[in-house]
Amino acid sequence: NDHTLKDTDDFITRLKNFDIKANHFMASLDVESLFTNIPLDETIDICLQKLFDDKCVSKISNLTKSQFRTLLELAVKECYFLCNGKIYKQLDGVAMGNPLGPVLANIFLSHHESRWLDQCSIRFRPKFYVRYVDDTFVLFSHKSHLSKFSEFMNRQHPNMKFTYEAENDKKLNFLDVLVEKSGNKISTSIYRKPTFSGLYSKFSSFGPMQYKTGLIRTRCIEY
């Protein structure tokens, strides 16, 4: 949907194209343990609804709805792990490290958040709302709206629990960006966590080449 961010560059572009007011208050929302709290059956239903109701599948595959459901269930529900010599099966949620994790998280939240925002009272609805997987950046017309909006969001789905961080001294970090507000002006710079050491694996180390070249591209874009 329109609220989903592709990357940091997309976030900066959207933010700088937004008409910032001097009274706007910045905050970020985070979904607690999103991947392990994704309801798989509900999310699979959402996937099938979007694929088959919009007839997307017929353009690329001859699979039936039942066959597609079976494939999705095999990909995300047959997850086992070994702990203290015992084998366990994960009953719900996306397993950590599953490549489908970010995809299913985006599908689930994208399906719900537009409706949640429409149902939210206009009195404390955010003026600006964008999300990257489980991290959301919002702008309110008053700082008191943040707690009200957080309470509203925490009532929407039993699996989704949101925490928030408010701006401090007109500054807020989101993803790897430090956002600073001065009047109706916004400036951005690179944000580094206090634990950042600046150390990276050697280029000659044994690892996928796409990860190494991806890191170089990312650093070039940042600077």
Language-model regions, residue ranges each:
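Charged structural interfaces that engage phosphate-rich ligands
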Residues: 1-223
